[in-house]
């Protein structure tokens, strides 16, 4: 198998480089074809990678970057004021062909602004979109946009649908069912842009558009790709994660309530742990920036080791599936 080379913004995120480096080293050990480039402060990173085997160390490179973009920094400031940030250097490595993907847990707005500036968008795409996998009763669905674009035109939603459909195909779904998230399934429901997007999708070649979908339909697994603007998508994503955490906590508290419930809980514990692991936000961490001339995956800023590993794994899949090239080909056909 040919090598996959990924740049890691090692300084991004809420907690600094420790968990990012730990996740990177775990992925390196588990994937013999993987090569990682850690971007950040060399002295700090060298301390965190001690103890690696010679074979793993040979597939690990450190590239220096003297600046760090904070989580509360404005995108314009990050774009103009920090030319040697770890985030920007990682993206420039991708632009220059030295790596095949970039993964960052840093400031979302800054990452989007820098990605658009450094990498540019694919022809036919006005705005990149963030997409992630959401667990459903039947598996997973790809939800986009997740916050990159708060206000979207019908044409933007069409572009998101095309990109989401191709992303789902890379995950093994031959003919993804594409739906628009709406407040009802009837044709008269929704705002003007959503209604216009429905008309565009009905006429689009090669898109398996199935109509409007409500939030409960998403979780029942009625679609493989669900499209919405970033305002709605971000709220849905964060609500889903919060709900999963709350349900797990409530069930755990219920089983600890008294002696009888503890006995029942002991019997149900293996099943509950499996369910918790399946729904845990960390397992689904990693939102792809679709529509760029390169692979960029955004991890939650608060992600731990397991969560950041999931983001790296998503980047690996997109490298193996040549996602930007496939997107480019489909966009030429569908948006021409």
From Swiss-Prot:
It is found in: Cytoplasm. Keywords: Cytoplasm, Lipid biosynthesis, Lipid metabolism, Phospholipid biosynthesis, Phospholipid metabolism, Transferase. It comes from the Bacteria. SUPFAM superfamilies: Isocitrate/Isopropylmalate dehydrogenase-like. Pathway: Lipid metabolism; phospholipid metabolism. It holds the Pfam family FA_synthesis. One of its GO terms (molecular function) is phosphate:acyl-[acyl carrier protein] acyltransferase activity. One of its GO terms (cellular component) is cytoplasm. Homodimer. Probably interacts with PlsY. HAMAP family: PlsX. Belongs to the PlsX family. This is Phosphate acyltransferase. The lineage of its organism: Bacteria, Pseudomonadati, Pseudomonadota, Gammaproteobacteria, Pseudomonadales.
């Amino acid at each position: 198998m040919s090598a996959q080379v990924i740049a890691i913004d090692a300084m991004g995120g809420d907690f600094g480089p420790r968990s990012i480096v730990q996740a990177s080293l775990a992925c390196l050990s588990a994937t013999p074809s993987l090569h990682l480039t850690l971007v950040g402060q060399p002295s700090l990173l060298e301390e965190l990678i001690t103890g690696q085997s010679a074979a793993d160390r040979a597939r690990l490179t450190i590239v220096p970057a003297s600046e760090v973009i904070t989580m509360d920094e404005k995108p314009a400031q990050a774009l103009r004021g920090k030319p040697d940030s770890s985030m920007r250097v990682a993206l420039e490595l991708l632009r220059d062909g030295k790596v095949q993907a970039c993964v960052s847990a840093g400031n979302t707005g800054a990452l989007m602004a820098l990605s658009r500036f450094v990498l540019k968008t694919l022809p036919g795409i006005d705005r990149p979109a963030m997409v992630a996998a959401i667990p459903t009763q039947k598996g997973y669905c790809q939800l986009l946009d997740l916050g990159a674009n708060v206000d979207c035109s019908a044409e933007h939603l069409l572009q998101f649908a095309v990109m989401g459909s191709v992303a789902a195909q890379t995950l093994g779904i031959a003919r993804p069912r594409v739906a628009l998230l709406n407040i009802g399934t009837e044709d008269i429901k929704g705002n003007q842009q959503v209604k216009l997007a429905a008309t565009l999708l009905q006429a689009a070649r090669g898109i398996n558009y199935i109509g409007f979908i409500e939030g409960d339909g998403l979780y029942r697994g009625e679609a493989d790709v669900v499209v919405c603007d970033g305002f709605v998508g971000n709220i849905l994503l964060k609500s889903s994660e919060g709900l999963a955490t709350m349900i797990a906590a409530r069930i755990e508290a219920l089983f600890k309530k008294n002696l009888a419930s503890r006995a029942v809980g002991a019997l149900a514990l293996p099943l509950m742990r499996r369910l918790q692991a399946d729904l845990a936000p960390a397992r689904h961490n990693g939102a792809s920036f679709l529509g760029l001339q390169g692979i960029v995956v955004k991890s939650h800023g608060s992600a731990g080791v397991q969560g950041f590993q999931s983001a790296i794994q998503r980047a690996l899949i997109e490298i193996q599936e040549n996602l930007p090239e496939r997107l480019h080909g489909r966009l030429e056909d569908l948006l021409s």
